[in-house]
C-alpha cells in the first residue's frame, strides 16, 4: 500500500475501476494523493504490478464483511440426538417427536436412538418396528438416511431435514427481520 510499493512502473486503475495505463510509481502516488485516497497493490505478481486508487479502510471493512458472511454461510449442519427406551409411553413419545421436528425445522440432522436394557436386547425387531413408526411420523419434516443399525446396546437411524421445509422457514424468518427494520 502506498509507499511500500517497490516496482518502478505500475498498471494504474482509478477508483471507478477504469484503467489509466502504465505509469511510474511516483505519478501513481501523486494521483492518489490528489484524489485523497490510498494506492493499494491489487496484483503484486503481474508484470507490471496492478495498483488501484481506493479508500483502503473501506476496502478492508468490505473484505472483513465478505469473510464474515462466508463463515456464517459455511456453518455446518449439527447432529442432534433423541434417545428413548423401547417401552416408551405415548406422551413421552410425542414429546420426543416434537423435539425432533423442531431440530429438523432448524435445519439440523437428528440421530434417533433406542436404548435396550436387559432382556430387551433379545428383541431387536421391536426396536426396528418403533424406529419405522418414528420415521413415518416424522416423514413430513425429514427423511431417514440410514436404515436402523445396531450400536452396542441400542439401535439408531439418522434423519435429515427436507430442504424445502428449511428453505421456507429461512425465507420467512428473513422476511420477518425485514419487516422489523424501518
Swiss-Prot record:
Its main location: cytoplasm. SUPFAM superfamilies: Translation initiation factor IF3, C-terminal domain, Translation initiation factor IF3, N-terminal domain. It comes from the Bacteria. Disulfide bonds: none annotated. Gene3D superfamilies: Translation initiation factor 3 (IF-3), C-terminal domain (3.30.110.10), Translation initiation factor 3 (IF-3), N-terminal domain (3.10.20.80). GO terms for molecular function: ribosome binding; translation initiation factor activity. GO terms for biological process: ribosome disassembly. It holds the Pfam family IF3_N. Keywords: Cytoplasm, Initiation factor, Protein biosynthesis. InterPro entries: T_IF-3_C_sf, T_IF-3_N_sf, Translation_initiation_fac3_CS, Translation_initiation_fac_3, Translation_initiation_fac_3_C, Translation_initiation_fac_3_N. One of its GO terms (cellular component) is membrane. It is found in: Cytoplasm. Belongs to the IF-3 family. IF-3 binds to the 30S ribosomal subunit and shifts the equilibrium between 70S ribosomes and their 50S and 30S subunits in favor of the free subunits, thus enhancing the availability of 30S subunits on which protein synthesis initiation begins. Monomer. This is Translation initiation factor IF-3. The lineage of its organism: Bacteria, Bacillati, Actinomycetota, Actinomycetes, Micrococcales.
Amino acid at each position: 500500500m502506498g509507499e511500500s510499493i517497490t516496482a518502478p512502473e505500475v498498471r494504474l486503475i482509478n477508483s471507478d475501476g477504469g484503467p489509466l495505463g502504465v505509469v511510474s510509481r511516483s505519478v501513481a502516488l501523486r494521483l492518489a494523493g490528489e484524489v485523497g485516497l490510498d494506492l493499494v497493490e491489487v496484483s503484486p505478481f503481474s508484470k507490471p504490478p496492478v495498483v488501484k486508487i481506493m479508500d483502503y479502510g473501506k476496502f478492508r471493512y468490505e473484505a472483513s464483511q465478505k469473510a464474515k458472511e462466508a463463515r456464517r454461510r459455511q456453518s455446518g449442519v449439527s447432529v442432534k440426538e433423541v434417545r428413548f427406551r423401547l417401552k416408551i409411553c405415548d406422551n413421552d413419545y410425542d414429546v420426543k417427536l416434537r423435539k425432533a421436528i423442531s431440530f429438523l425445522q432448524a435445519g439440523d440432522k437428528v440421530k434417533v436412538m433406542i436404548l435396550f436394557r436387559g432382556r430387551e436386547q433379545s428383541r431387536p425387531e421391536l426396536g426396528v418396528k418403533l424406529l419405522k413408526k418414528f420415521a413415518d411420523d416424522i416423514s413430513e419434516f425429514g427423511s431417514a438416511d440410514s436404515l436402523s443399525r445396531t450400536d452396542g446396546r441400542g439401535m439408531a437411524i439418522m434423519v435429515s431435514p427436507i430442504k424445502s421445509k428449511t428453505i421456507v422457514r429461512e425465507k420467512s424468518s428473513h422476511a420477518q427481520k425485514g419487516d422489523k427494520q424501518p
